[in-house]
């Protein structure tokens, strides 16, 4: 099914919560593993369906943040998601306490329980209001970024559309583009500062309500960190300072030499890799996707089938357009067992990187599309290393 044909309707939140509650009661009352397993699969299906609706609303909202319908839907999901998280937390708690835990482990592995224990540490009904407010603030941030209309050389550009000028080999033009972007950020500085300040205090409150020193520990739990700790990250940071910073310093010094610039360089000069200009795609968006199709077909039968399915079902929105949210991402549409790629092509090397980076995420999700539990589709320990 093509993305544009996928139906969306706001779910009845109270009815969905009741469905989760009924499944929870049946799960707790199960007398055998077979009974518990059957309810488990029902809960998986419901969870996947609700998540699909949420993702459809989110994707369509980010494609055009000016769309009034999906703007209202995001307001709904910002309030609904924490309440649904409460349902999920109750389910995870029941799974952890289940007399059939060993049976589930034998069939699906122990990772689902490791993750459930972490998720349990990241939630409490006491922070429902803060979670809803957090969603609202992050949505406001996305809309603010998407609203950028930056005048430059007689045109008006979004942040993404301005990027080619910020990489221009002409020093004066490149610097002017950076200044134009900086002027827009400065103009909206109070709004950005307000959102940041509110989020910092909000998340600090959430962490303290859960009994932590602040947000850091809660942040680790929310990210599902199941294979390394804060201490490990501190060691990694020390290694970055010791090994990577000197290497990066030498690379930037070489770059300054190529450009004939004094080191350290300013932000505008940092953006230019070669005096002749940065690498750029040889074609437009259609040409890039055509080459991506050729690449994935030659890579393996599986990647070929995957990428052609993405193209046929219009599961990529890559053009940079007014009102579109910034950046790029990949997500899953569970009911359809397919991923979706969101990007902002702007004529820079970033366009080609998206076809490998986000498509890499998408292929991983595609290969995991029928995994149980549904949370295994996106293993946070492996999505970004």
Task: Mark where each language-model region is.
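Conserved small/polar residues in nucleotide/adenosyl-binding loops
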Residues: 383-385
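Short beta-alpha connecting loops at secondary-structure transitions
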Residues: 340-344, 371-380
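Auxiliary, metal-adjacent structural segments of Zn-dependent hydrolase domains
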Residues: 258, 276-336, 348-349
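A well-structured
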Residues: 1-278
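Catalytic Zn2+-binding segment of zinc metalloproteases
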Residues: 360-373
